[in-house]
Regions:
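Hydrophobic alpha-helical segments at protein termini of multi-pass membrane proteins
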Residues: 1-365
Length: 365
């Protein structure tokens, strides 16, 4: 049978699920570059895991026999080795200021696990008799399990960033143990007999259930991030009440910004969305910096927040005064008096730094 179609399915279907999960990151706090970097970590984890699993099999086979050793590796050794190797880069990257919260961790972990699964799918296709059945079965079961298990580690790593003392390490260990437990249970299921009938349905259920769990965790994280934005988006960082209210209604943004496209053109609509996304990212970085306990991490987050603030001011100038006034009229703050509203608009039409000269630049440019 031609291997091209099964191989394509083995790679593209997991990639499609990764894209689905990635699209849940409303504020795009995790860059696509970092997603690709974590995928490279997942790709590199496969040959490392293969060497370690093979070594464990050869050692165990001397005392247990080949069949028992193979089962032990699949159900005990491999889940430990693969979960540690898949998410090692994610755990390392979590110490960098680019990593904001566990929403990033879930997406980065899912990316690493998905890349690992892609290579593993291709490896198993080289040994399969029915290539199409092997490919389809794996992309809806094993591949999704790999991504979801690694996402659990990413969530734990993201929460551990803001823990203190032993709680940080406890969170990380619990995340890895949870991933290993999911992986072990799945491998025990699929190695208990032929992959058909009820067992196949259960395996697919575990895979799809893992994706649903990952999406639920991301939505939980987005809910917490929305709370962060309510606390951090204020005049102290150059964000008006109206702009803050609009950012917090991000799910409705396409509808809310549609009149801008109609009145000012599609280019201004894109610029407005970019401006509001930068505000959201600034709010998240500001809150993360406030929560960070390590001085180096705190300094890195504050530096990123300062850079985002400059980009936000540039984006505000690109949007222009008249369009900004329209944006602020979309979601008026509750309870503002006329004078409060006027004061807010006079203050917030200016960049966060250099207000007088920023206003002149806006008017001239």
């Amino acid at each position: 049978m031609n291997t091209l179609l099964p191989a394509t399915i083995a790679v593209l279907v997991p990639a499609a699920f990764l894209l689905l999960v990635r699209r849940l990151d409303l504020y795009a706090s995790g860059s696509i570059r970092t997603v690709l970097l974590c995928m490279l970590g997942g790709l590199a984890a496969f040959p490392l895991s293969f060497v370690l699993n093979t070594g464990a099999y050869q050692t165990l086979a001397l005392s247990m026999g080949g069949a028992a050793a193979l089962l032990a590796v699949k159900t005990v050794v491999a889940p430990v080795v693969e979960e540690l190797s898949k998410s090692a880069l994610v755990a390392w990257y979590a110490r960098r200021p680019e990593f904001t919260y566990f929403v990033d961790g879930a997406i980065f972990g899912f990316a690493a696990g998905t890349a690992f699964a892609m290579v593993e799918n291709l490896f198993y296709l080289t040994r399969a008799r029915d290539l199409m059945a092997m490919s389809v079965n794996r992309v809806f079961s094993t591949s999704l399990m790999h991504g979801s298990a690694s996402a659990l580690v990413g969530v734990a790593v993201g929460r551990a960033r803001f823990g203190r003392g032993a709680s940080r390490w406890a969170s990380l260990v619990l995340g890895w143990l949870a991933a290993m437990a999911v992986h072990t249970s799945f491998n025990q299921l699929v190695n208990a007999g032929p992959m058909m009938g009820a067992r196949l349905v259960m395996a697919v259920g575990v895979g799809l259930g893992g994706v649903a769990m990952t999406m639920a965790l991301i939505r939980w994280g987005l809910w917490e991030e929305a709370r962060w934005l309510r606390e951090s988006l204020n005049l102290d960082i150059g964000v008006s009440n109206q702009e803050s209210g609009l950012v917090q209604r991000w799910k409705e943004l396409d509808t809310l910004l549609a009149p801008i496209g109609a009145h000012f053109g599609p280019e201004k609509r894109v610029l407005a969305a970019t401006f509001l996304r930068l505000q959201a990212q600034l709010g998240l970085k500001t809150k993360a910096a406030a929560l960070a306990s390590e001085p180096a991490m705190k300094a890195g987050l504050e530096q990123q927040a300062a850079a985002l603030r400059l980009r936000m001011d540039e984006a505000r100038r690109a949007v222009g005064v008249y369009c900004m006034t329209y944006i602020r009229s979309i979601v008026p703050p509750e309870g503002d008096t006329l004078w409060q509203s006027l004061e807010s608009r006079l203050a917030d039409d200016l960049p966060s730094e250099g207000k007088m000269w920023g206003l002149l630049a806006d008017r001239v440019g």
